[in-house]
Amino acid sequence: TMGQSQGAFTSSVVLYKLNRQDPYASCDLAGVAVYDLGLVGKRYCAVAEDGLHFIDRKGRAAASYSYDGGVLRRCSLEGDGYAAVLLGRYKVGSQLRLVTVNSDGKELGSLDLDGDVLSMSASGRYVAVLFADRLVIYNKNLKEYATLQGVSSAGDVLMRGDGSAVLAGSAAASVFLP
C-alpha cells in the first residue's frame, strides 16, 4: 500500500496468507515509493526510486541496495536469485550501468553500457539487453554469453531460463538460440 506522511511517500508491504483475510506481517518503507514487488531468492524485493529493498517472509527489512545517485531505468526480478537493474547516470542520456544484485543486497556484477537500450529482461542465469543494433546476453555475473547483430526490427526482448531469448517487433517475433 502507498500513502503520504509529512509530505513524503510511505509504502507498506503487507503480507497475507492465501487462506486468510487478515495480514500476518507488514513492513513500512518510509520515504519510499515502491514501483514493483517480486520474489528474489527467498525474499521479497521492493523496487523503489532510491534502491532495492529486501524483506524477509516475516515482514522484516532484511537488506537493501542503493543506486548511489543512479536513476532507475529498468528492473527485472525474474533472475534465479538476483535482480537485474539498469541505471542511468543522469535522467536523460545513454550512459548506463547494468547491475545484478542478490537478495542480500550484494552486487553480483556491474557493467557500464554506452548506447541506446531498448529493452532488458532477466530469467534464470541470464540477462538479455537489447540495444538498437544488437542483442547481448550476459550471465548473472555480467560476463558476456552471446551476441546477435542486426536486430534493428526488434523493439523488445524476453529472456528465457534456458538461455534463449525471444525478440519481438511490430510485425514479427523470433527466438535466438545461442
Which role does the model predict for each range below?
Residues 8-29, 48-70, 91-113, 133-151, ...:
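Surface-exposed loop/turn elements that mediate protein-protein interactions on large endomembrane-trafficking
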